[in-house]
């Protein structure tokens, strides 16, 4: 326990919490325009072609965002919504595109976990 004199000389310092998703600026989602849509390979034990896109956000940030689900309709100049959430095996990818919002279509023929992929309830 510090004495009062010690606290007068050097007050207690608040810990600064650093955001994992700085480009969102404390917003739940942000809108942006795709500048490049491409595939990339994951880190060591995994192997795949992960679909990602480079996005210029409305606040001027340029970020890389993962496109989840099977198949997508994104190309350059598509307007997309991004949310936070990193992809563990893709270094530098800290955001996800929101499927079924703005220009990003939902996943075709998706039956389970539909809300995460922007798919409406199937008819009967």
Curated annotation (Swiss-Prot):
The lineage of its organism: Bacteria, Pseudomonadati, Pseudomonadota, Gammaproteobacteria, Pasteurellales. The modification 3-methylthioaspartic acid is found at residue 89. Part of the 30S ribosomal subunit. Contacts proteins S8 and S17. May interact with IF1 in the 30S initiation complex. This is Small ribosomal subunit protein uS12. GO terms for cellular component: small ribosomal subunit. The gene is rpsL. One of its GO terms (molecular function) is tRNA binding. Belongs to the universal ribosomal protein uS12 family. PROSITE patterns: RIBOSOMAL_S12. It comes from the Bacteria. One of its GO terms (biological process) is translation. Disulfide bonds: none annotated. InterPro entries: NA-bd_OB-fold (IPR012340), Ribosomal_uS12 (IPR006032), Ribosomal_uS12_bac (IPR005679).
């Amino acid at each position: 326990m510090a004495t009062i004199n010690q606290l007068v000389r050097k007050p207690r310092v608040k810990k600064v919490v650093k955001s994992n998703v700085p480009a969102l600026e404390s917003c739940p989602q942000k809108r942006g325009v795709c500048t490049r849509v491409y595939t990339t390979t994951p880190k060591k034990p995994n192997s795949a072609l992960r679909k990602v896109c480079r996005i210029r956000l409305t606040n001027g940030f340029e970020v890389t965002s993962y496109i989840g689900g099977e198949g997508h309709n994104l190309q350059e100049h598509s307007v997309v919504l991004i949310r936070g959430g990193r992809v563990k095996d893709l270094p530098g990818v800290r955001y996800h595109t929101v499927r079924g919002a703005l220009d990003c279509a939902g996943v075709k023929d998706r039956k389970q976990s539909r809300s995460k992929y922007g798919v409406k309830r199937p008819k009967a």
